């Protein structure tokens, strides 16, 4: 598995996702990678913190949208732009009482 990407920018995505998980009270964060169809590289970042409210799930990638009192609301929007710049995607796969899972897909 090989991804050609800007290391600093991709690191920023992981920093944003891990920071959000910790702010949500996560005790466990799992990062896994696999090959997808057509040689896509898929990375999933899962945590057991408080779920993202259903009412917010469609808006979390909008710049300056936040559900936190102290949040700026730019972390996930920056992460989405970084993925777009790398011809990839980031999406929220699920967020419920058991787990919140984000998926990064590199094409």
What are the functions of these language-model segments?
Residues 75, 79:
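Short alpha-helical Gxxx[C/S/T] motif in the catalytic ATP-binding
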